[in-house]
From Swiss-Prot:
InterPro entries: Glyco_trans_2-like, Nucleotide-diphossugar_trans. One of its GO terms (biological process) is cell wall organization. Its EC number is 2.4.1.-. This is Probable xyloglucan glycosyltransferase 1. It is found in: Golgi apparatus membrane. It comes from Oryza sativa subsp. japonica. One of its GO terms (molecular function) is glycosyltransferase activity. Keywords: Cell wall biogenesis/degradation, Glycosyltransferase, Golgi apparatus, Membrane, Transferase, Transmembrane, Transmembrane helix. It is a multi-pass membrane protein. Belongs to the glycosyltransferase 2 family. Plant cellulose synthase-like C subfamily. The chain crosses the membrane at residues 120-140, 166-186, 503-523, 528-548, 640-659, 665-685. It comes from the Eukaryota. Its main location: Golgi.
Amino acid sequence: MARWWGGEGRGGSGTPVVVKMESPEWAISEVEAGAAAPGSPAAGGKAGRGKNARQITWVLLLKAHRAAGKLTGAASAALSVAAAARRRVAAGRTDSDDAAAAPPGESPALRARFHGFLRAFLLLSVLLLAVDVAAHAQGWHAVVPDLLAVEGLFAAAYASWLRVRLEYLAPGLQFLANACVVLFLIQSADRLILCLGCLWIKLKGIKPVPKASGGGGGGKGSDDVEAGADEFPMVLVQIPMCNEKEVYQQSIGAVCNLDWPRSNFLVQVLDDSDDAATSALIKEEVEKWQREGVRILYRHRVIRDGYKAGNLKSAMNCSYVKDYEFVVIFDADFQPQADFLKRTVPHFKGNEDVGLVQARWSFVNKDENLLTRLQNINLCFHFEVEQQVNGVFLNFFGFNGTAGVWRIKALEDSGGWMERTTVEDMDIAVRAHLKGWKFLYINDVECQCELPESYEAYRKQQHRWHSGPMQLFRLCFVDIIKSKIGVWKKFNLIFLFFLLRKLILPFYSFTLFCIILPMTMFVPEAELPAWVVCYIPATMSLLNILPAPKSFPFIVPYLLFENTMSVTKFNAMISGLFQLGSAYEWVVTKKSGRSSEGDLVSLVEKQPKQQRVGSAPNLDSLAKESHPKKDSKKKKHNRIYQKELALSFLLLTAAARSLLSVQGIHFYFLLFQGVSFLVVGLDLIGEQVE
């Protein structure tokens, strides 16, 4: 055996194998491939035993080296996270210290009350945990002490607490838990039905097809764009932007390169920037494309009210808009493909009742960090399942605010853009639906854009997306009831579109998993079954991740992060429903038919240089008058989010209490969910600012 292990085979000594461990990237397959050396069994020799054994030894050593490298990398990553957390705590910068970090429209008083409630709940849970640990040490977890037979103040107090818990707290808590479970099951059934609808669409190959393939439909005659210019309808392209210094060039360039007759489309760059330097850069970019022969205009409002809705409304009031049949909207970070109009506008031909054609979003930075990966999962499900199913079966869905083509007649018939909510896109979609207009969703037409890379930006976006629908529901509920659409469409709008998907979802997510579940740990007489805590949420997460199969490794972080975001969504839903926060009240300013801004550019001129010299100083002087003391650009910071941090400690405390009740699944869920809240509370997800 010693001779065999030493490589002294019967046919002679084996060839020594040298493996340099300094190169951990060296493939194991290279070692295994080199086994068939002269004299080895693979080569027909009998002296390969010793050599093969030695190679196996070295391969095992190489694998161990690789494993050690991976462990070192994991340890390094853990140390980096710990160092970032330590810096965050040492800096002491919280979301309450900086008003700019709070979501727009969030009431400071509401935020303070909500945070106070969470802190009080946390202190109470810590106290109850201490009491339960002391009682567990006395053995009272196995035998409930008799109130009449106990001796000692603590024993009497604990026996009284058990009685109050059993007779007064448990029934009410169990009722709330059962109610939330019912809502959870209803929402899960809705999600399952949407997935089945998407599966049916895939199996049947259902998708909108233009009735006519000529002209803009991409038919044989569409290759020669200029020759068939008469068949291409007039299209107005709008790019609303505000201080979009980073992306204005790519969005304007992508729109100006659209494959459409230049005489048949006009680009409006709607600049609401309050920074004079940014406005000058955008204006210069517009003039550059004007010199290239593109029909493009630059608009800058003097009175910037109504945010995006006000900007779009002002642009639609221009007198030349009456010459156009369709309007396309692209946000400043969107980059449409050259054939975007050819693949969307033809769907209107022969469908006079179609008011909107919506394209899908794709994301250029979906793999930037964990936050963008999780956002990609959510939005892939939104477009692939929700939008597609609602478009095919109901001809209605929420307009996404960009990458969509509107029939101008439908916009005007629905009342145009309104500044009454923070979700002007959903507002116009609901009003158009009440007027009887149909929507088409084109899943195979994609438009690239960017995802928020920092948690602060994502938090603000989600707050607006979940407060606005509740505002809109309050404003249009009576209009829905009085409208002439069918009963089923009214039911879909009220109960599915608004209540179930915009109100019930954030309500039960936060209440059930962040409040009721921890409470059941301290009041164990009220129970939440394991299938509610683990199995059904895992199944729903699996369904959500199916449209983005490459994101399957992130299914657990996705489930935990969605529950973490329920705090922001719940707070936003309450703010919008009860109109909390002064920023929600937008003043509606009516506009005249023709804009009178001094720096509004007219149609394309032959001498753009004179136009630039004459208008740029006016823009600078206007900016100086409006903002005489312009602050320098604020630096970005990572900060501590107090509500998320308080909830993390609450859930971790409840996880510790679940160990006393020997509830394994509940313990692991609370532990991982508490860690998830801790990571988000310390702003360790998303962009890290050094």
